[in-house]
Amino acid sequence: MNFNLVEMYNGLLRFNKHILNELAEGLKHLPNLDGVSKGDSLIINEQGNPAWGSAAFIPTFENAAYGIEWTKDDNDIIRIGNAKFHRELPIQNRLKGCVYNEKKISYFLNPTGWAKPLENGLIPPLDGSDGDVGVRVPEFYMCVKDTGTKYQLWISDFNIDGTFTRVHPFIISHTKTMTRTREDGKEEVFSACIKPDDTRYLGGNKNSSVVATKLQGRPRTGINYDKANEFCANRGDWITMIDYLEYCAIQALCYIEYASFDNQAALNTNLTSEGFKQGGLGAGVTNLAWDRWTAFNGNNPIVQTYWTAEHNIGNGSTNGDHYELGNYNTDGSNLNTYPAVYRGILNFFGDIWTLIRDVVIVNRNANYNSVYLLKKGVNHADITIDNIQDKCYFIGDQANSNNFITEFDFRFGPYFIPNKVGSNKKADYNWIRGSNGQDTDKAVRVLLFGGGAYDGSGAGSGHFGSYWVQSAFGAHVGFFTTVKLD
């Protein structure tokens, strides 16, 4: 985005309307000047509201942060921190749909429907001709506190006590990414809202035996980890697959917004008596049987990328609208499925899985699989069981059993690594390679998240899959892309 207040346009100087709009939005929240004295400055009072005063603002967990707390191995989640922030969701509300070109945001889309006119009356093209379509995620900080018997997950605009992890501002593709083929024959990623009758963009695994209208306008799948990286590199060094911290940041925002780890909780648009969000994003595209999905379109993505624009979801979340699969069932009848949307991000979970860029997983023993982050400049293909300690950072242990997640490993940061599993579901499903407790397969693996159209109640943003090696690929796996803005 151009951050200059004054810019050159057609040889003339003019004010940058995007900066003015951002300033105007911020000024709406300033307190009035009643009772203000000379020398007063803007502070945050004990209630977490902006006010004029002489005292310097000192951010604390009570006035400048909000989050959730739960007893370890239990589901008794409560909201903590600034209650006003829980009602107003200041960080979540800064996620905005936008059209961007490389690292510059060209304009923000209409928050009530991306295909609707902008403030200047322009109806934005969403087909990529004016730039890619994505969701801008703001800079913020997050941390996990271990009190001994409880965990606390916090987010804030401040690194309050020096223990918070900074989340850099970034743009995420508004759904798993598409690709397009250049004149030189190379395939590159791009993010747009494409209708299923657009013959220019064939998605999925591009299987010629599948009816084209069931692949057109869909995310790209059928490629392995290295090929996904290649398609990003073909576009430029400014765009990559989503990394683990970026993914966990969006998870945290959703978990705190609904005070629940169950993304699939039923949609409930009513607020609680305290004015808080409740429920979840609904089941998502998770109700397809594998064999029927295979017959329908070869396990390729179900929902076209234009769907959220068509349904005027804008910067909002799941609204209850369905997607209809014609002639899906064996008797020729149709099937309805309900895409999960979080803050404009289509299929935040469900439909197809997403690859994560920088994570390496290797079996440790019968009880755990070790989870690592690649060090800067290290490629996934360079990792072996012998050099993993030198080329990676250890960040936690994944439970070596297939079951629902009951607790996470937060020892090394705000990463939602499933450390304990069982039938008392807290969050989604943990899926490993092979049978429970296997300790002979030491292959280097990649991380998948979210679950697919066949995963039912196991799906969700926390559905953690470590069963793929780097060379694996499938029609049911794609990936989000992100652009780091600093």
Positions of PLM-derived features:
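A short, polar/charged loop-to-alpha-helix boundary motif
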Residues: 362-376
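N-terminal module-boundary/linker segments of secreted carbohydrate-active enzymes
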Residues: 57-163
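Short aromatic-cysteine micro-motif
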Residues: 124, 128-131, 156-348
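Residues within well-ordered beta-strands of beta-sheet-rich folds
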Residues: 136-138, 171-173, 344-349, 480-484
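C-terminal, surface-exposed recognition/capping segments
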Residues: 248, 270-309, 325, 348-360, ...
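Short, intrinsically disordered N-terminal pre-domain segments
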Residues: 1-20, 486
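Acidic glycine-/aspartate-rich tracts in secreted/extracellular proteins
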Residues: 44-49, 140-142, 177-178, 246, ...
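Extracellular repetitive beta-rich solenoid segments
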Residues: 24-57
